């Protein structure tokens, strides 16, 4: 077999491998390259290629572990599992070494030694436990030997291809390692106070921009597409969260639509091209990779939050029954939860107030044409009610009290605690909690309530944790609900 035929044959193997990775079929991808590697080792056809295949086998393990999110689960008490980062670092070094080795222009004709196909590195227990993957699959070591094809005038074509491919795979595993750090940061921040989504979105945007023109070889298209759709969908959702917290209707809606489009493409990539038109071939949710499942849940969470924050605007386009039906289909129906809190605790009303002071482009009714000049709100109108239950409750008599509490108790509210205030003159009790830096939820009662009322406090804390995003980002860790 001459070099050209060999390269054509191995390209088909690589195409199948990367297609399997793109469809999240990691076991098949690993099996494909291991089978070909073993065949090359037996015939001594090309050792350099077999070393690349060994590294790709290890990469399939890393990719499966990455998509499972198992690396976010602690390895032991107060000890992080760093096995995936170690695996990507080993792959980074190996692809860099193979790239440099393939670039060498002084081939030596010899047969690979018996140790050429022997293991040098064993994957971590957490990586091994994910599947039936072999526990001794490793990254191989390249000696200075090459195959008989090195004597062919066409051998430099093969070496150039391998050098280029390994260089691009090196860029890919570096990008993956940054993504691992990003998800780890997302989960860690979910355990604390109000998350800084603007900073997180900027970090993710930087990862996307830096890798936009990297690992672009046609054979890597399935890998590149999956990488791009994953991070772009997540970035649009984070941007939507930032805009929701600023009560920007149109911009938030556009980012949600973009996220929906990316997720549609990514979910479709779970199916092989020939099966995409067959409804019965759709994968069940319990068979989706954990990361895919989580980002779909995040999308549902953002739609629910968008519906809550812009309920007044959306309800003008639908009947009350249609809004109820739409809400019942959501993963979390925030409006129904607020209604339940109001009814069970006998509240006069539960409202969400937005602090519009200093917000550029603020407009109470959704979209505003750029040429339309809108006066900045003043007085109590600078704290508009963006949601109220009962929806017909429009009394402004409590607004001055609420604004005073928000202003005087800002430190307590920003610490994410429940703030209680009783107005003895009006005989009204107020419970307040921050949902976003500019959004406060308040429950108003017509009698004196205990500030430690278990039901009211627990319900408001749970609602706040969900709406802020701490709950959904905490679900990054497998097993968290």
Predicted regions and their residues:
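Intrinsically disordered, Ser/Thr-rich regulatory regions of eukaryotic membrane-trafficking proteins
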Residues: 1-481
């Amino acid at each position: 077999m001459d070099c050209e035929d060999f390269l054509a044959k191995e390209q088909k193997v690589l195409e199948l491998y990367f297609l399997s990775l793109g469809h999240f079929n990691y076991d098949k991808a690993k099996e494909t390259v291991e089978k070909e590697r073993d065949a090359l080792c037996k015939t001594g056809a090309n050792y350099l290629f077999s070393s690349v295949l060994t590294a790709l086998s290890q990469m399939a393990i890393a990719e499966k572990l990455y998509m499972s999110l198992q690396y976010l689960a602690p390895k032991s008490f107060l000890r992080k599992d760093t096995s995936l980062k170690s695996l990507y670092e080993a792959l980074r070094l190996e692809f860099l070494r193979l790239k440099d080795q393939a670039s060498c222009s002084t081939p030596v004709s010899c047969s690979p030694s018996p140790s050429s196909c022997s293991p040098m590195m064993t994957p971590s227990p957490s990586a091994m436990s994910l599947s039936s993957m072999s526990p001794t699959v490793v990254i191989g070591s390249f000696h200075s030997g090459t195959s008989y094809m090195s004597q062919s005038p066409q051998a430099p074509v093969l070496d150039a291809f391998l050098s280029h491919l390994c260089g691009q795979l090196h860029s890919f595993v570096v990008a993956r390692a940054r993504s691992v750090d990003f998800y780890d940061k997302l989960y860690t921040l979910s355990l604390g106070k109000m998350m800084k989504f603007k900073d997180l979105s900027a970090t993710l945007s930087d990862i996307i921009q830096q890798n936009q023109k990297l690992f672009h070889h046609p054979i890597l298209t399935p890998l590149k597409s999956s990488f791009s759709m994953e991070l772009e969908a997540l970035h649009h959702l984070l941007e939507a969260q930032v805009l929701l917290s600023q009560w920007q209707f149109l911009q938030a809606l556009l980012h949600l639509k973009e996220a929906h489009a990316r997720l549609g493409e990514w979910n479709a990539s779970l199916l092989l091209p020939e099966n995409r038109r067959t409804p019965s071939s759709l994968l069940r949710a319990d068979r989706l990779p954990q990361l895919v499942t989580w980002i779909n849940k995040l999308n549902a969470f953002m739609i629910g939050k968008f519906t809550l924050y812009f309920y007044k605007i959306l309800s003008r386009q639908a009947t009350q029954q249609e809004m109820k039906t739409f809400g019942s289909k959501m993963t979390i129906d925030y409006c129904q939860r607020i209604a339940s809190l109001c009814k069970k605790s006998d509240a006069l009303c539960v409202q969400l107030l937005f602090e519009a002071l200093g917000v550029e482009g603020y407009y109470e009714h959704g979209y505003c044409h750029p040429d339309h000049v809108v006066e900045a709100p003043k007085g109590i109108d600078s704290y508009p009610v963006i949601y109220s239950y009962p929806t017909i409750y429009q009394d402004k008599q409590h607004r001055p009290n609420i604004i005073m509490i928000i202003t005087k108790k800002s430190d307590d509210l920003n610490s994410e605690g429940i703030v209680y205030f009783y107005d003895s003159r009006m005989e009204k009790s107020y419970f307040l909690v921050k949902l976003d830096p500019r959004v406060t939820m308040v429950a108003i009662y017509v009698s004196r309530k205990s500030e430690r009322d278990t039901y009211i406090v627990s319900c408001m804390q749970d609602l706040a944790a969900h709406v802020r995003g701490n709950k959904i980002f905490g679900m990054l860790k497998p097993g968290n609900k």
